[in-house]
C-alpha cells in the first residue's frame, strides 16, 4: 500500500482502537516513522521521508497514534503506554531491518519500541538497523510537563483530571490528563542505562523552546553502550522542518541506508 491508509486494530474490548497506517513497499532497510505529541503522519518531515523512500525504492511505514490524525480514539484517552502499544503493533507489520525515525515524543516512542523489541526477540534477532531521533523528548510528561507546572496546575490535574495547555503550534489547547502524567511515570527511561544495539543519531535544535537541547545531551549519557552521534543545530527550533533541517535529516538517513 502507498498513499492510502489501512487500519489495524490494537487492543481488545473497550480498549480497542483503529490505527491508520500508510506503508510503502520497497527494499530494506525500511524507514519507520514515529511522530510527535499532537502531530500526524502528514507532517513536513514525515512526507519528506516518504518521498525519500519512494525515490530510493525503500520501504516506508507511517502511522497515526490513537487520537491523532486519521486514527480512531479520543486524544484525551491517550497515554504513553497506549501509544507505545500502537507503535509496537505497527512495527510488527513490517519485515526486515528497520531504521526508526522518531520526532519529539516519537523519540521516546522509538526508545520504548526498541526496548520491547529487544526484550521479545533478543539482540541477535533484532531488526533495529539504526535510529534517528529528532528533538527527542523521552520522559517529557515528567521532566518537561509536570516538573514545570505550577502548584495550581498540578492541583487542577489531580482534582479535575485534566488541564488545558495552550499550544504554540496550533489554536487548539493540549489536553494534559492525569492519566497521561501518571502513566508516563511507568515508562520513564532516563533513570537507567539504555542499550539499543544499533547506531543512533540525535538531531537537536539549540533554539528549541519545547525540548531544551540539554535534554538531548542528557539522553546521550544513558546511551553509553551504543554508537551515538549528537548533532546540535545552533539556529534550529523544535520542529526542525526548514529545508536545511530536512536535508540534514535525509543525509543522515542516507548514510545509514548505505
Give the residues covered by each predicted segment.
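N-terminal cap/lid segment of alpha/beta-hydrolase-fold proteins
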Residues: 1-26, 242
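The alpha/beta-hydrolase serine catalytic core
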Residues: 5, 124-233, 237-257
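Short beta-strand element of the alpha/beta-hydrolase
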Residues: 28-36
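The serine-hydrolase catalytic nucleophile loop
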Residues: 37-50, 214
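Alpha/beta-hydrolase active-site loop signature
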Residues: 38, 65-70, 138, 237
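Conserved alpha/beta-hydrolase
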Residues: 48-72
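Catalytic nucleophile-loop/oxyanion-hole region of alpha/beta-hydrolase
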Residues: 68-94
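Primarily recognizes the serine-hydrolase "nucleophile elbow" in alpha/beta-hydrolase
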Residues: 89-153
Amino acid at each position: 500500500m502507498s498513499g492510502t491508509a489501512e487500519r489495524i486494530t490494537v487492543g481488545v474490548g473497550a480498549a480497542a482502537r483503529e490505527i491508520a497506517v500508510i506503508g510503502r513497499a520497497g527494499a530494506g532497510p525500511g524507514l519507520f516513522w514515529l511522530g510527535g505529541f499532537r502531530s500526524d503522519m502528514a507532517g513536513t518531515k514525515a512526507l519528506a521521508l516518504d518521498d525519500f523512500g519512494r525515490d530510493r525504492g525503500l520501504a516506508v511505514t507511517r502511522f497515526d497514534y490513537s487520537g491523532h490524525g486519521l486514527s480512531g480514539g479520543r486524544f484525551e484517552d491517550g497515554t504513553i503506554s497506549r501509544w507505545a502499544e500502537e507503535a509496537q503493533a505497527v512495527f510488527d507489520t513490517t519485515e526486515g531491518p528497520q531504521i526508526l525515525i522518531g520526532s519529539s515524543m516519537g523519540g521516546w516512542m522509538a526508545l520504548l519500541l526498541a526496548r520491547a523489541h529487544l526484550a521479545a526477540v533478543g539482540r541477535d534477532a533484532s531488526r533495529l538497523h539504526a535510529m534517528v531521533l529528532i528533538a527527542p523528548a523521552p520522559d517529557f510528561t515528567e521532566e518537561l510537563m509536570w516538573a514545570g507546572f505550577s502548584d495550581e496546575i498540578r492541583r487542577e490535574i489531580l482534582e479535575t483530571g485534566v488541564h488545558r495547555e495552550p499550544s504554540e503550534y496550533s489554536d487548539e489547547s493540549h489536553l494534559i490528563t492525569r492519566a497521561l502524567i501518571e502513566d508516563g511515570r511507568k515508562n520513564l527511561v532516563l533513570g537507567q542505562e539504555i542499550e539499543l544495539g544499533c547506531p543512533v543519531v540525535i538531531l537537536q535544535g539549540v533554539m528549541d523552546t519545547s525540548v531544551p537541547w540539554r535534554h538531548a545531551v542528557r539522553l546521550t549519557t544513558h546511551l553509553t553502550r551504543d554508537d551515538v552521534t549528537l548533532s546540535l543545530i545552533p539556529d534550529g527550533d523544535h520542529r526542525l522542518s526548514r529545508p536545511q533541517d530536512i536535508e540534514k535529516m535525509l543525509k543522515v538517513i542516507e548514510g545509514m541506508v548505505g
